[in-house]
Curated annotation (Swiss-Prot):
Residues that coordinate or bind ATP: K11, F59, R87, T93, R104, N114
GN (gene name): ndk
Species of provenance: Rhodopseudomonas palustris (strain HaA2)
PANTHER family, per the entry: NUCLEOSIDE DIPHOSPHATE KINASE, NUCLEOSIDE DIPHOSPHATE KINASE DDB_G0292928-RELATED
Compartments where found: Cytoplasm
PROSITE patterns documented for this protein: NDPK, NDPK_LIKE
Protein name as it appears in the record: Nucleoside diphosphate kinase
A single MF term (Gene Ontology): ATP binding
Length: 140
């Protein structure tokens, strides 16, 4: 399997509880390297652009409000099959359905406050990474 990069967000429910280190430990334990990372307060415009795919969904406004409610940590992860590997480490969106040992099983508060986001495909990973990082900010 090829080395890939994927995009990750540690969401406001994770930063407010100061569990970003615990989440990073799970990421690294899975064999993924954090090659870029920064803590930001996402603007409304950034959140609306990032989640534009959900614009017509009834939860869009609530999602944007949540993602701008506090700091987030945006990351670029790298490793063999990084996209699938990180999705496995995150676990199901619904923490009650997530496998034991996954980030969401261990740390998510609810379906809405599920602690993390990860890219779902190489194309979306490239777009998401470019939204938050310049090339020289990614150091592999």
């Amino acid at each position: 399997m090829a080395v890939q990069r994927t995009f990750s967000i540690l969401k406001p429910d994770a930063t407010e509880r100061n569990i970003t280190g615990a989440i990073n430990a799970l990421i690294e334990k899975a064999g993924l390297r954090i090659v870029a990372q920064k803590r930001i307060h996402m603007t409304r415009g950034q959140a609306e652009t990032f989640y534009a795919v959900h614009k017509e969904r009834p939860f869009f406004g609530e999602l944007v409000d949540f993602m701008t409610s506090g700091p987030v940590v945006v990351q670029v992860l790298e490793g063999e099959g990084a996209i699938a590997k990180y999705r496995d480490v995150m676990g199901a969106t619904d923490p009650s359905k997530a496998a034991d040992g996954t980030i969401r099983k261990l740390h998510a508060k609810s379906i809405g406050e599920n602690s993390v986001h990860g890219s779902d495909a190489p194309e979306t990973a490239a777009i998401e990474i470019a939204q938050f990082f310049a090339g020289n900010e990614i150091v592999g």
